[in-house]
């Protein structure tokens, strides 16, 4: 079936067997969606966020976290409305496809693809740091640890949706229990003034340690707050993955908004507690945490000593594992949706004949993320790569996320303006102003991210990926499109109700 003249795209007829080989199973309710959203993010409360102390000090980190929370509130309320109105696995790509056409949908999906392929790679570097610290493995063997963890958690996601969601629920609850245990443990061991405020500014403008504390809340001023925004993103990054579970949700129009909003409320409370307590523990401090790959473990060690370091390390690993597991889930669905519609090679969207999970998409996505890690590792050398790979990958993931957020917020605004006829079971209380705030904060965050010296190293890989996939879509993909649920909805201008295949 050809498109009208001038569109430059062609839809190919497929038979019922095409969608039969790409079937998904409905399982998730509100609780499962909540666990999926919180689990995807929770690793950011265990590692990554703390690098912001080096650019903003404690007060800069707190205020940056608040600004980023506003951005995510605007985003999550927007996608809560869109996911109920367009309950398709495509999520960001689906929203942008309906609002901005095929190329808009493709580029939005590509931005989100960078986020979900690279974020597991970031998390596994933190996991490896914890494992090396606990077991005493020489960091030179880190690639082996990466491969082992990817293999285990891709397999868990492949062998059944119900198993995947049950694992997600269990490790998310354990992760939150670990954080609550740490909060309760930390409160009697706090010295906020001496340790949280122990960062000053040296002659070269870099952070220096104040042994007696008592420093400024904002040692780098307001510019330090803005420079800390990319690190604060790690406190909430990936909550937006929930709409990718739309076709595996029992009632996405009702449950998806509830799951997203409950997840965001949980994360805001946890983020505030960890930013307040982790650097305030006696013997830790903001300065030490500003370069730590295992901040929560540092806090637990300071409270309980080294005698139980193995047990404490295993406990501290849970949050990282929760996010690693759930983002591999999201990665598979994101690749699956673009492939099912023909934007990516269509073979990637075939689901497992028994378990009905997008196993090909998850395996290929994991292989790409792992390949990027190995290329960086061997091109830089083990010693240099060990100290920079986490930051390089984090910049790649955050840049992809920011572009995706801008596109999703723009899609929300356009759909509010141009598609008033679409049924909206849920409406964002923040409306268009919330979406505008998301765009503004995301643009500012990108602007300050560019100043990170590791940004250029990471963004070059992102540009290469964009060039390769844009060439594929321009030359091949757009001539092999399929009327998937996302495409059918967009083609009809939102008039065709969603139909499950």
What spans do the regions from the language model cover?
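Hydrophobic, membrane-embedded alpha-helices of multi-pass small-molecule transporters
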Residues: 28-47, 68, 207-281, 306-330
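Extracellular loop-to-transmembrane helix junctions
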Residues: 46-141, 263-269, 273, 458-467
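Membrane-interface "cap" regions at the ends of multi-pass membrane proteins
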Residues: 1-62, 72-77, 88-89, 437, ...
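TM-loop-TM module centered on a large, flexible mid-protein loop between adjacent transmembrane helices
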Residues: 94, 101, 132-137, 201-215, ...
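C-terminal membrane-solvent junction of multi-pass transporters and transport-like membrane proteins
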Residues: 23, 348-359, 402-454, 487
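Hydrophobic alpha-helical segments and their helix-loop junctions in multi-pass secondary transporters
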Residues: 134, 173-211, 233, 275-282, ...
């Amino acid at each position: 079936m050809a498109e009208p003249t001038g569109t430059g795209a062609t839809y190919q007829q497929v038979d019922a067997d095409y969608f039969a080989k790409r079937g998904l199973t409905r399982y998730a309710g509100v609780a499962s969606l909540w666990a999926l959203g919180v689990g995807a993010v929770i690793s950011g409360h265990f590692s990554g966020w703390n690098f912001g102390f080096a650019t903003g000090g404690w007060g800069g980190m707190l205020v940056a976290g608040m600004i980023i929370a506003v951005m995510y509130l605007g985003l999550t309320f927007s996608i809560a409305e869109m996911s109920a109105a367009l309950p398709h696995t495509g999520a960001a790509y689906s929203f942008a496809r309906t609002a901005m056409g095929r190329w808009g949908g493709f580029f939005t999906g590509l931005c989100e693809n960078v986020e979900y392929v690279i974020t597991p790679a970031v998390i596994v570097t933190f996991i490896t740091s914890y494992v090396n610290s606990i077991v005493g493995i020489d960091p030179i063997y880190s690639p082996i640890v990466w491969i082992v963890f990817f293999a285990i958690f891709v397999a868990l996601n492949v062998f059944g949706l119900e198993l995947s969601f049950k694992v997600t629920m269990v490790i998310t609850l354990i992760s939150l229990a670990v954080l609550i245990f740490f909060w309760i443990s930390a409160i009697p061991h706090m010295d906020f003034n001496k340790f949280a405020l122990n960062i000053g500014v040296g002659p070269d403008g870099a952070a220096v340690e104040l042994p007696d504390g008592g420093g400024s809340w904002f040692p780098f001023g307001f510019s330090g707050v803005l420079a800390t925004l990319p690190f604060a993103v790690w406190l909430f990054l990936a909550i937006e993955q929930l709409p990718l579970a739309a076709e595996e949700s029992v009632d996405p129009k009702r449950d998806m908004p509830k799951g997203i909003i409950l997840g965001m409320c949980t994360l805001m409370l946890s983020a505030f507690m960890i930013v307040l307590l982790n650097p305030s523990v006696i013997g830790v401090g903001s300065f030490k945490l500003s370069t730590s790959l295992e901040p929560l473990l540092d806090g637990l060690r300071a409270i309980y000593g080294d005698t139980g370091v193995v047990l404490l390390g295993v406990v501290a690993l849970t949050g990282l594992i929760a996010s690693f597991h759930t983002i591999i889930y999201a990665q598979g669905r994101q690749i699956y949706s673009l492939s099912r519609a023909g934007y990516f090679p269509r073979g990637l969207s075939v689901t497992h004949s028994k378990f009905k999970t997008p196993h090909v998409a998850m395996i290929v996505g994991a292989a790409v993320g792992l390949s990027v890690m190995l290329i960086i590792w061997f091109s830089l050398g083990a010693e240099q790569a060990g100290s920079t790979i986490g930051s390089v990958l984090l910049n790649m993931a955050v840049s992809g996320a920011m572009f995706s957020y801008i596109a999703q917020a723009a899609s929300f605004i356009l759909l509010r303006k141009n598609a008033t006829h679409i049924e909206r079971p849920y409406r964002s209380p923040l409306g268009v102003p919330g979406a505008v705030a998301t765009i503004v904060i995301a643009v500012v965050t990108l602007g300050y991210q560019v100043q990170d010296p590791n940004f250029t190293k990471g963004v070059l890989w992102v540009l290469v990926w964009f060039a390769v996939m844009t060439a594929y879509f321009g030359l091949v993909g757009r001539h092999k499109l399929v009327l998937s649920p996302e495409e059918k909805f967009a083609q009809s201008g939102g008039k065709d109700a969603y139909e499950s295949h």
